[in-house]
């Protein structure tokens, strides 16, 4: 176990180089909570809440850095960690919000006209297998709180709703029950009902017709809400490469890599233009007049980027004599490749105050580095725009490092019928001197695997 250490090692050094855009008050684009029910392993509706509870921590820095106030009634958390055994449903939280984002952005497209909705209800109960799946998200946008959700099955949108509130009470903008709509205070939706298919979201269709509120909400889903897998570097490596084109962002990325003590002095990219073949075989019947399999001139040149890291080379006296280029994919570790891929996205999220979900954040990373990445978010200095990080993890060292408040720690656990529950550590009475890591490993909070007797298995194999 790591020693219990308050604070982060490289926070001060990171803060010195980070260039944050002056975006004003970024509190108004934050996530408040997300709920899902009857989806994958979630039979009942569960809620992941980023609302800070009324608890106070013994370490006051956690309260000062990990929480930001919105108003007198609401404070939000800058990060949340989700723990659980393998196959307990941790990743399904990320999958659920990823589906919601995808459906909001794509359901109204013509390509989805005749397509079934790719939804997976909880399959281990006769009660739910034919019922719709439930999704709801609550978020801040331009000083207003929006609560948007829908129920959907493979054929159609069963219900949909949008509510808005500011300092006053919550008011309904619209509600939908199959093909029945109520538009109380949503003028941009007038005349759009007949244009909304049964398998498309009303909000998405209204946004296509330049609805002001709906357009802002879709941009929030598209630009502010980000989701990635910590196991698939290729998904987000492109953003780091694009960020290297900006001089300021390039400096930040290189400094970020250097501060993590990876033995890297710098980054160099080599762009190679791959000449096209003189001809190619067409399989695009519309573009090429209905022909198929004919040869056509090809003028498209493809560019590939090879990233190299710079390492110092020393003589026998330990004096640096030169620098050596390493191909990052061939010569660097999986962890270094992941950190390079993450760098652009992490720094952009902090720079612009976005929301980032990462499934398996700690995969291929040293526990100390994982902690440092989290500390970048749990800091007023390096996270002045109140970006939010929500991630799944197996790294129990984080529980001993005084990194989180109790309301930032979440668990997933399956019952004996295969249904996942999601709950927070704040629901438990935890003593001031309690070792969260030890108590979690010992099963005090649940969400651990129940492992069978392997000795019996080995004995059977030898019989």
Locations of the language-model features?
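Short, surface-exposed charged micro-motifs
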Residues: 47, 136, 147-151, 173, ...
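Coil-to-beta-strand transition motifs
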Residues: 43, 130-132, 143-145, 154-158, ...
């Amino acid at each position: 176990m790591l020693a219990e250490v308050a604070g982060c090692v490289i926070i001060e050094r990171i803060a010195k180089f980070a260039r944050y855009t002056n975006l004003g008050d970024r509190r108004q684009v934050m996530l408040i909570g997300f709920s899902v029910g009857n989806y994958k392993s979630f039979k009942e509706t569960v809620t992941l809440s980023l609302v800070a509870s009324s608890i106070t921590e013994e370490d006051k820095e956690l309260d000062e850095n990990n929480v930001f106030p919105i108003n007198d009634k609401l404070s939000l958390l800058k990060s949340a960690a989700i723990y659980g055994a393998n196959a307990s449903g941790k990743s399904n939280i990320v999958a659920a919000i990823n589906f919601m984002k995808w459906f909001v952005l794509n359901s109204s497209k013509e390509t989805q006209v005749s397509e079934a909705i790719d939804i997976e209800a909880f399959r281990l109960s006769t009660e739910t297998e034919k019922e719709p799946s439930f999704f709801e998200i609550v978020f801040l946008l331009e000083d207003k709180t929006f609560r948007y959700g829908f129920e959907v099955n493979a054929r159609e949108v069963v219900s949909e709703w949008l509510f808005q509130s500011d300092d006053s009470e919550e008011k309904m903008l619209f509600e939908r029950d199959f093909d029945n709509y109520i538009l109380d205070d949503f003028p941009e939706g007038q005349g759009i009902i007949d244009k909304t298919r049964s398998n498309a979201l009303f909000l998405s269709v209204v946004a296509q017709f330049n609805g002001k509120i709906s357009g802002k909400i879709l941009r929030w889903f598209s630009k502010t809400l980000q989701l990635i897998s910590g196991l698939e570097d290729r998904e987000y490596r492109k953003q780091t490469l694009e960020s290297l084109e900006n001089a300021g962002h390039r400096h930040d990325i290189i400094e970020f890599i250097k501060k993590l003590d990876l033995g890297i002095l710098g980054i160099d990219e080599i762009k190679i233009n791959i000449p096209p073949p003189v001809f190619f075989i067409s399989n695009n019947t519309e573009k090429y007049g209905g022909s198929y399999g004919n040869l056509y001139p090809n003028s498209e040149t493809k560019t590939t980027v090879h990233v190299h890291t710079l390492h110092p080379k020393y003589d026998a006296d330990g004096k640096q004599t030169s620098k050596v280029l390493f191909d990052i994919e061939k010569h660097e570790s999986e962890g270094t490749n992941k950190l390079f891929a993450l760098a652009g996205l992490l720094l952009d999220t902090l720079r612009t105050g976005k929301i980032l979900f990462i499934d398996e954040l700690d995969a291929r990373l040293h526990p100390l580095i994982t902690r440092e990445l989290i500390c970048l978010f749990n800091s007023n200095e390096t996270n002045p725009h109140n970006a939010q990080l929500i991630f799944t993890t197996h790294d129990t060292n984080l529980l001993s490092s005084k990194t989180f408040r109790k309301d930032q720690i979440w668990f997933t656990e399956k019952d004996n019928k295969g249904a996942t529950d999601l709950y927070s550590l704040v629901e438990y009475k935890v003593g001031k001197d309690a070792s969260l890591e030890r108590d979690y490993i010992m099963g005090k909070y649940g969400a651990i695997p129940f492992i069978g007797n392997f000795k019996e298995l080995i004995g059977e194999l030898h019989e």
